Amino acid sequence: MLELKPPLVLLSGPAGFGEYLKLMDHRYVGGVLLKTVTLHPKEGNPTPRMADSDFYVINRIGLENPGIHAFVENIPELPVPMIASLGGDSFEEYLEVARVFKKVADRFYAVEFNFSCPNVKEGGLSIVKNAEEWKKLLNTLRKELPDSFLIAKVGVEGIFVEDAAEFVMKTGWDGITLVNTVRGLHFEKDTMILGGLSGPVLKPIALRAVYEVKKRFPELFVIASGGVYSVKDAEEFLKVGADVIGVGSALFKDPGVVEEIGKYLLEVKR
């Protein structure tokens, strides 16, 4: 089982490549889940890329990243454990990204594969919808990275999280991140912004997902992702069995909340 002290990570996407650590006391951060990296560099989507309200954030970054080859040559040096995040648009791309990453895998605490980005044309979603292909990919990646702690990042669209968790367990993976953003739409005056929905509005969905998965597979490692903006939010995710609490879009609102949650997680008895 992966152990982080405190059991709190800055989530892939908002955390970038660890830049937000400069804004907080890293003693209260257990680790950083780095920005998702793909086989080829991605420029991301055109602006506007973000929109928010009191209850949600819509982002359509589009997995902007330098590509896996540039990434392995410029791995950030951070004072906390790093978890890599890898993505792809096809079976072959996921496999090639894993092969390149394998050269530096021992520098990371774990590696997450993003199978659920809603802001790019494919982003792994099409593979997850094809159960047999996804199971084949999970098996192949497990064999490619036999010594890594493997985490699958999934959403709630295209597959039931309990089924996704079962595939992850049966193929020898170690954990799952629940949940990624869901598709949303926001109007900024007359501009329509389509992207991934996150923030407080996502918390009830994420809580239910974590609850259902841990009820059925208590031994599966779960990173809770979705609407953690306060100590109370973190407490509720612990109650449904989350092993690690992820903080994402809250970083845009108030990075200071990370220290508050981190202090709580260091003190709480589990």
From Swiss-Prot:
GO BP annotations listed: 'de novo' pyrimidine nucleobase biosynthetic process; 'de novo' UMP biosynthetic process
Chain residues that bind FMN: 12, 35-36, 114, 153, 179, 199, 226-227, 248-249
Primary location class: cytoplasm
Pathway noted in the entry: Pyrimidine metabolism; UMP biosynthesis via de novo pathway; orotate from (S)-dihydroorotate (NAD(+) route): step 1/1
Pfam families cross-referenced by the UniProt entry: DHO_dh
UniProt enzyme class: oxidoreductase
An example molecular function term from Gene Ontology annotations: dihydroorotate dehydrogenase (NAD+) activity
E.C. no: 1.3.1.14
Function recorded in the entry: Catalyzes the conversion of dihydroorotate to orotate with NAD(+) as electron acceptor.
Subunit structure: Heterotetramer of 2 PyrK and 2 PyrD type B subunits.
Protein's name according to its UniProt entry: Dihydroorotate dehydrogenase B (NAD(+)), catalytic subunit
Native organism: Thermotoga maritima (strain ATCC 43589 / DSM 3109 / JCM 10099 / NBRC 100826 / MSB8)
